[in-house]
Amino acid sequence: MNRLSYIFLPLTAIGMSACSSGKEEVKRPNIIFMMTDDHTTQAMSCYGGRFLQTPNMDRIANEGVRMDNCYAVNALSGPSRACILTGKFSHINGFTDNASTFDGNQQTFPKLLQAAGYQTSIVGKWHLITEPQGFDYWCILTGQHEQG
C-alpha cells in the first residue's frame, strides 16, 4: 500500500460514516406565551407582588423566561394585542383602536411557529373582532370588541 492509501482510506471511512448516519432530531423548546390584560406586576408574586400569592405562575416564571422589561406600544387592548402578534406598530398593522378589524392575512408569530412545525392555540380573550388565524386550536371569548 502506498502512502496516499494510508491517508485516503481513513478519510473515506470517516466521510462515509458521516453520510450514512441518521439526522439527529433537533429538540425544540415548548413555548407557552401568556398574555394578560389590565394588571400590573403587583398582581403576581413572581414579580414581587405581596397582595397575591401565585405559586404556579412563580414556578413557570422560574423555569422559563420571565419578561421584566416589556412595554406596550399601544395602550388599548386590541391594538396592543395586534402589535404583539405582528411585531408591527398599530399604524402599520392597521389595528389602531378597539373598533378596528384585525387583518389576519398578515404575518403573525403564531403563523411563523406553525411554519416551524409547532402546534399553536389561543384560549381566552382575543379582542381583535375577526376569527383567529395561525392557530391549530382556538377558544376565544366572544363579544370582546364591544367592551373597549
Where do the language-model regions lie?
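Formylglycine-dependent sulfatase
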Residues: 2-8, 12-148
